[in-house]
Amino acid sequence: VTHELALLAATILLALFQLMLAARLATRERGMAWNAGPRDKAVPPLGTYAGRLDRAFKNLMETFPLFAAAVLIAQATGVHNGLTIGGAHLYFWGRVLYVPLYASGLPYVRSAVWSLSTFGIVLLLAAAVFSAA
């Protein structure tokens, strides 16, 4: 297993953790009946921390398919180098840091970390595509 695939697997575990944490906080606020029910009726917005963790998870889901595709392109082209490894690390560790930064409400640092993690995707993809050419 390459570093990039290991970090892809680690990101899946991070996503599961974020999903369960956000769901737990939402259930704490809205109750078990809401969680077990069909959720047909509109509900008020989540509170501060539950809402932030829900949005952090949704943000991960927006970028994760791009990261996964970039890793798989690198694997398919046989490109495995410092740039692909570095890009995968930037993405994963940026996403790890993003969760507590978003939960704490720290705006500019959170955005900078998001930018670094997104740059990791670009780095990984560029290294895979241009090294294979």
Regions found by a protein language model. Give the residues of each.
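Juxtamembrane boundary at the C-terminal end of a transmembrane helix
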Residues: 124-133
